[in-house]
A protein has these predicted regions:
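Short beta-strand edge segments in extracellular beta-sheet folds
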Residues: 102-106
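Extended low-complexity, serine/threonine- and proline-enriched intrinsically disordered segments
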Residues: 37-57
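Short acidic/polar inter-strand loop motif in beta-rich domains
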Residues: 90-99
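Short, compositionally biased P/S/T/A/G/V-rich stretches that sit at domain boundaries
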Residues: 1-13, 18
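Aromatic sugar-binding surface patches on proteins
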Residues: 66-73
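Short amphipathic, basic-aromatic surface patches that mediate peripheral association
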Residues: 24-41
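Short, aromatic- and glycine-rich surface loops/edge beta-strands on solvent-exposed regions
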Residues: 83-91
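Extracellular Ig-like/FN3 beta-sandwich strand-entry sites
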Residues: 17, 80-84
Length: 106
């Protein structure tokens, strides 16, 4: 399991725009680069990132080989009600990581 960091407010007022920042430790190996022994390193990419606010998709991104290792993704959404945000990274070789964070809306 990769280390994921999610930075966002724990509380917000209804209608506030909240900024969300995510970072995941991942090599994002393109499959084009030779290793120390000269053999091509196998491709290992995160292909898709999604964020659901309760069950509503609020952000998604497709990632490509040009994305650097440890991809940082920042986006905003509107706080509408208390709930859970679910962050999902999916990639090559069956890689899937899911993290959740709660948001309390007053």
């Amino acid at each position: 399991m990769a280390r994921a960091l999610i930075t966002m407010p724990a509380t917000a007022k209804r209608g506030d725009v909240i900024d969300i920042r995510t970072l995941i430790a991942h090599p994002m190996e393109t499959g084009y680069r030779p290793g120390a022994d000269g053999a091509i390193l196998p491709r290992n990419l995160i292909r898709r990132f999604t964020c659901h606010y309760d069950d509503v998709l609020v952000f998604s991104a497709e990632l490509f080989p040009a994305v650097a290792a440890n991809p940082f993704i920042a986006f905003s959404t509107v706080a509408i009600a208390s709930g859970t945000l679910r962050f999902v990274w999916t990639g090559d070789n069956g890689f899937t990581q899911t993290e959740t964070t709660s948001l309390v809306v007053a």
